[in-house]
Amino acid sequence: MFITEKQVWMDEIVARRASSSWDFPFNDINIHQHHHRHCNTSHEFEILKSPLGDVAVHEEESNNNNPNFSNSESGKKETTDSGQSWSSSSSKPSVLGRGHWRPAEDVKLKELVSIYGPQNWNLIAEKLQGRSGKSCRLRWFNQLDPRINRRAFTEEEEERLMQAHRLYGNKWAMIARLFPGRTDNSVKNHWHVVMARKYREHSSAYRRRKLMSNNPLKPHLTNNHHPNPNPNYHSFISTNHYFAQPFPEFNLTHHLVNNAPITSDHNQLVLPFHCFQGYENNEPPMVVSMFGNQMMVGDNVGATSDALCNIPHIDPSNQEKPEPNDAMHWIGMDAVDEEVFEKAKQQPHFFDFLGLGTA
């Protein structure tokens, strides 16, 4: 009879199970020793086809032949919600509650502490279902103890807290002994609050925001910001615009006709609004360039290094009769005469600042 390789392999598995040996069945020695054996019955082949082999079949047969076997015994092991199996209900551990304490639990804990005292925590935990002795102890000393001081920390307490932390470090239980009525948790939390406050105060962003909130920028100045005894000065402020000085490094000083200085808290440059209205009425443009503390207007460049034209108040409706503003002259240089002003009205030289040429 021809013996196939599959029959030899199945016969080897049956032999190894019968001898309770766990040697690898495909060793060449074992195969040659049992090559003459083969499956004699179809029952052996069915056993080999089952995933558990003949063990599962024999267990099923023994259970069916046992009259005392019942389905209730098969459920002897029970599985809890946590996935753990217990052989009997008597060996199940008590399920401990986790999470926030409920008001009913706090009331029950206060009653038990009043009966057993704040030291028998294991006994109290047996009476309070779902909580351990440690959980009851921490809840009492950190939240429910009537001796807890819940008032805000004073400056003196904060100073002592910082000194104690420099001495003891993060030993909060030891530090809490220096503060009667304060728990170690409250001491630790308030230390972190103080450190966060100090960090915010020393940060540059905090100082910058505080400075801006205390001194907000104002778009227009009032007479109170520029005290000056000259009466013409206030009239000039009411009819002119103010522009912030874009180049504070020039340090231009402002003077009136009578050399009365103008004081400014914000270091601003006063410019008459009608100074540049010549562009609107096709008048000769005035090119003004600034080099250091010098200003060049028209042809008046280099003759007097600190000269500046006296710009009058020009009415757009009457360009032929300009009325000079005697209250104020341009600032930072000496006053110039009428001849300089006439030169300023002439066609000035073109200054090619961008290098684009005349085209």
Curated annotation (Swiss-Prot):
InterPro entries: Homeodomain-like_sf, Myb_dom, MYB_TF, SANT/Myb. Transmembrane segments: none annotated. GO terms for cellular component: nucleus. Disruption phenotype: Defects in organ separation due to abnormal cell division and expansion during early boundary formation. Failure in accessory shoot meristem formation. Its main location: nucleus. Residues 121-143, 172-195 bind DNA. It is found in: Nucleus. Residues 93-144, 145-199 form the HTH myb-type domain. Residues 58-99 are annotated as: Disordered. Keywords: Developmental protein, DNA-binding, Nucleus, Repeat, Transcription, Transcription regulation. It holds the Pfam family Myb_DNA-binding. Residues 63-73, 82-94 have a biased composition (Low complexity). CDD domains: SANT. GO terms for biological process: organ boundary specification between lateral organs and the meristem; regulation of DNA-templated transcription. GO terms for molecular function: DNA binding; DNA-binding transcription factor activity. Expressed in organ boundaries. Probable transcription factor that involved in boundary specification, meristem initiation and maintenance, and organ patterning. Functions in both lateral organ separation and axillary meristem formation, in part through genetic interaction with the NAC domain genes CUC2 and CUC3 and the homeobox gene STM. May be recruited by a variety of developmental programs for the development of floral organs and the initiation of ovule outgrowth. This is Transcription factor MYB117. It comes from Arabidopsis thaliana. The gene is MYB117.
